[in-house]
Regions:
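Alpha-helical repeat scaffolds
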Residues: 16-25, 55-76, 103-124, 150
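Amphipathic alpha-helical repeat scaffolds of TPR domains
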Residues: 1-7, 34-56, 71, 82-102, ...
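Non-membrane alpha-helical segments in proteins
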Residues: 1-12, 21-25
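Residues that mark the junctions of alpha-helical repeat units in TPR/alpha-solenoid scaffolds
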Residues: 1-2, 77, 84, 110, ...
């Protein structure tokens, strides 16, 4: 029953409860319900990333849940490379958002932010070469050259 309630918390958008309960389930070694073919870490990472991508595309905030789960993805959870790469890509793209929620390096005027975004995107590419960040990284490099002329 606990597993079903945990999934339900995500379904109704109660991410505070869902994440907390999923972390408890992970700590206790509990399995996901039989209709979910992933472990808890993959389920939470997939669910929160899908939600964050939709929110960001509409220009809405994704915190605190994005960072909370991203910390787990980077440190505690062993996820497949493809999903981990998607998280790093999303982290980079979030730093580049314009007023409409689109990743646009030309909208960023701070070199440190651009460099951090490029760092996350490079990590994504290192984990999964087909994650699709090459063009964005080239645009970041161009923007950095504009901001830091020699």
């Amino acid at each position: 029953m606990f597993q079903l309630l945990t999934v339900w918390a995500f379904d109704v958008g109660d991410f505070d409860t869902g994440i907390a309960w999923a972390e408890l389930a992970i700590a206790q070694g509990q399995h996901t319900p039989s209709n979910i073919k992933r472990d808890w870490a993959h389920f939470v990472a997939d669910t929160v990333l899908e939600w964050a991508e939709k929110q960001a595309a509409e220009g809405h905030a994704v915190e605190p849940w994005f960072s909370q789960v991203f910390d787990k993805v980077r440190g505690d959870w062993r996820l497949n490379e493809r999903l981990t790469a998607k998280w790093f890509k999303a982290a980079g793209c979030l730093l580049l958002r314009d007023q409409d929620g689109q990743p646009r390096p030309s909208a960023v005027g701070d070199s440190a932010t651009l460099e951090q975004a490029d760092h996350w995107l490079a990590q994504a590419e290192k984990l999964h070469s087909k994650v699709g960040v090459n063009t964005l990284r080239q645009k970041i490099a161009m923007r950095l050259r504009v901001l830091n002329p020699e």
